[in-house]
Amino acid sequence: MVESKVVVPESVLKKRKREEEWALEKKQNVEAAKKKNAENRKLIFKRAEQYSKEYAEKEKELISLKREAKLKGGFYVDPEAKLLFIIRIRGINAIDPKTKKILQLLRLRQIFNGVFLKVNKATMNMLRRVEPYVTYGFPNLKSVKELIYKRGYGKLNHQRIALTDNSIVEQALGKHGIICTEDLIHEILTVGPHFKEANNFLWPFQLKAPLGGLKKKRNHYVEGGDAGNRENFINELIRRMN
């Protein structure tokens, strides 16, 4: 007696083939992702070392220049700063529409919001218009690092996402060569070529009320108050509010 062959329908064979192809593709994708992650980890570590060396050399150079100026009986003048950090210190009471609009353009919608800005003529003109409502100055490396690591949120798909993973930074800014938090810090601190994209990715910082409170919000900093330009002393205020 001849045994009858079981004929597998063509649709089943096609489905089986598709499933095998999908399984192979999935396996290849997982392996590619693992390889990319390993390469990224090496690159991130290398860049972090490079940035650390760069910051240390700049600090060493600054100390040397200050010492040299002192020996010559003069004093060292810092090169013009490129980066500002602005904090809104007053609410909406008695605020005129134009001032309100500028504060919105600066992304300072709430009291104790803080943002980074590039120093240029347009920025300084806007700050003068809203000076009674803000305080600002030149953030140092420690301030930029602590703000981004402690209070940093990014904008990804129109959502506010905590910067808990380098992959979040890479998703948003990888096309600009910014693949980790240390890259982001470096781009902001040095006001790099993709500062605009990096800064727009950062959500405005929500700071806490400063320890010890503020003195006189309506008065200028140089008059013993809090508003306006406090230059390098912004770093002391950032510590109290972070």
Swiss-Prot record:
Disulfide bonding pattern of the chain: none
Family statement: Belongs to the universal ribosomal protein uL30 family.
Organism, as annotated: Arabidopsis thaliana
Classification via SUPFAM superfamilies: Ribosomal protein L30p/L7e
InterPro entries: Ribo_uL30_ferredoxin-like_sf, Ribosomal_uL30, Ribosomal_uL30_CS, Ribosomal_uL30_euk, Ribosomal_uL30_euk_arc, Ribosomal_uL30_ferredoxin-like, Ribosomal_uL30_N_euk
Keyword list, A-Z: Ribonucleoprotein, Ribosomal protein
Name of this protein: Large ribosomal subunit protein uL30y
Taxonomic lineage from the root: Eukaryota, Viridiplantae, Streptophyta, Embryophyta, Tracheophyta
GO molecular function annotation: mRNA binding; structural constituent of ribosome
A GO CC term attached to the entry: cytosolic ribosome
GO biological process: maturation of LSU-rRNA from tricistronic rRNA transcript (SSU-rRNA, 5.8S rRNA, LSU-rRNA)
